[in-house]
């Protein structure tokens, strides 16, 4: 399942990249607003609470604090490729740390000073929650979807607010593979490009 999702994300990203690169050969259309971020490489960090949306079995839902450092590469005026870190501290009812990398991620966004975006990604996460019902091993795969808004400041930096849904599972490596689904609300800051 996760392999198919990852392949679909890779195929979508490569298709969008090809379309974007072919569109870059056309002369630029006149724009009423100046481009807020002329650079290609960016760094941002976001953090916020995460809540398990549906607990497996009869256990109490997990709550955590999530931090997401992100390195982005602007492919087009509306498309960013991203590599994200995933750091979480589960605080209740079980305490544990979680860390991982999301190397296949992208963000599609509008232009201008206020940018609405949709994001998706897939990666690998290691968790200290192994053994609770739904997560039977330490290594798990993560798939995530998000939507948010960013306000670009005059110097090119930005503040953002994003709601993100993510699913952790071992992709059937160890039954019963119920996984964990969490929703997080992230507040972020992007450095000027």
Indicate residue ranges for each PLM-predicted region.
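Predominantly the C-terminal beta-signal and adjacent terminal strand-loop region
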Residues: 148-193
């Amino acid at each position: 399942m996760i392999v198919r999702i990852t392949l679909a994300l890779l195929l979508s990203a490569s298709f969008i990249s090809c379309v974007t690169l072919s569109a870059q050969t056309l002369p630029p259309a006149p724009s009423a607003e100046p481009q807020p971020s002329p650079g290609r490489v960016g760094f941002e960090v976001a953090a916020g609470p995460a809540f398990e949306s549906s607990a497996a079995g009869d256990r109490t839902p997990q709550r955590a604090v999530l931090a997401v450092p992100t390195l982005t590469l602007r492919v087009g005026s509306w498309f960013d490729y991203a590599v994200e870190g995933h750091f979480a501290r589960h605080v209740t009812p079980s305490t544990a740390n979680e860390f991982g990398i999301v190397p296949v991620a992208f963000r599609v966004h509008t232009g201008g000073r206020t940018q609405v975006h949709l994001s998706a990604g897939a990666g690998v996460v290691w968790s200290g929650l192994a053994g609770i019902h739904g997560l039977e091993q330490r290594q798990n795969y993560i798939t995530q979807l998000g939507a948010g808004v960013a306000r670009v400041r005059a110097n090119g930096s930005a503040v953002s607010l994003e709601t993100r849904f993510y699913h952790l599972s071992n992709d059937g490596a160890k039954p019963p593979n119920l996984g964990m689904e969490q929703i997080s609300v992230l507040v972020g800051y992007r450095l000027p490009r």
